[in-house]
């Protein structure tokens, strides 16, 4: 399943100014709203990042309205980088407006690296139907206050990640399993680096399969 119309570029209203957003639509009636969060803005992260683009295309292939957006200070989004605080509020604001636009649809949520941290910080308030975290930067940002997700949750981690401690991710997942929801599904890709060079097809296949199984 793929988009048959050009992506829609929308400027949503945020507390720091516009939130630049790219929206793609599935061929058939949508099953969900799916929001993807990009990696660190100060290191070139934006909605065009290839990893979050891959996650977004997987959401689209599974039948969702796929939404990517630029955090504050990136592209046409207003404001300046806020070390995750303002970015989390931007995500909450964007999802509220998307839900007002498509009130009947559940939310799927995903993020890569810094974006996975932001989406994890917001998920308790957003209550998504499912969650995808790619290379969550455990040890680089504060994960201590993140509530364990209560929805189906896929974590994809390369075991040759040069930026994230792979074992720290595994320990954090073990420590944050909750009886209130299904256990996280950890997929460790052998010989994959932080940006999954040459492995993005595996990321897309994993996300698509997880979403189809979880949203059935």
Describe every region a protein language model picked out.
Residues 174-195:
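Catalytic histidine neighborhood in serine/cysteine hydrolases
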Residues 110-119:
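Gly/Ala-rich beta-loop-alpha elbow adjacent to hydrolase catalytic centers
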Residues 51, 81-101:
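Alpha/beta-hydrolase active-site loop
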Residues 159-164, 194-195:
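Acidic catalytic loop of the alpha/beta-hydrolase fold
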Residues 18, 27-68:
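Short, surface-exposed "cap/lid" segments of acyl-processing enzymes
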Residues 149, 153-157, 161:
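Short beta-strand/loop motif that positions the catalytic acidic residue
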Residues 197-210:
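Post-His helix in hydrolase/transferase enzymes
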Residues 1-29:
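N-terminal cap/lid segment of alpha/beta-hydrolase-fold proteins
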């Amino acid at each position: 399943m793929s988009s048959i119309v050009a992506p829609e570029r929308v400027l949503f209203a945020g507390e720091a100014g516009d939130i630049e957003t790219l929206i793609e639509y599935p061929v058939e009636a949508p099953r969900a709203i799916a929001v993807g969060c990009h990696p660190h803005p100060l290191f070139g992260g934006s909605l065009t990042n290839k990893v979050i683009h891959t996650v977004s295309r997987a959401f689209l292939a599974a039948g969702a309205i796929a939404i990517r957006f630029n955090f504050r200070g990136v592209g046409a989004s207003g404001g300046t980088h806020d070390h995750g605080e303002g970015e989390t509020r931007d995500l909450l604001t964007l999802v509220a407006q998307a839900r007002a636009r498509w009130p009947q649809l559940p939310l799927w949520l995903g993020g890569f690296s810094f974006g996975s941290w932001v989406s994890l910080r917001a998920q308790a308030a957003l209550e998504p139907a499912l969650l995808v975290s790619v290379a969550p930067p455990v040890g680089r940002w504060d994960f201590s206050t993140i509530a364990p997700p209560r929805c189906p949750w896929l974590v994809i981690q390369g075991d040759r990640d040069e930026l994230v401690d792979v074992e720290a991710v595994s320990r954090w997942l073990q420590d944050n399993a909750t009886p209130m929801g299904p256990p996280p599904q950890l997929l460790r890709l052998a010989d994959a680096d932080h940006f999954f060079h040459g492995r993005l097809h595996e990321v897309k296949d994993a996300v698509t399969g997880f979403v189809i199984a979880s949203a059935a």
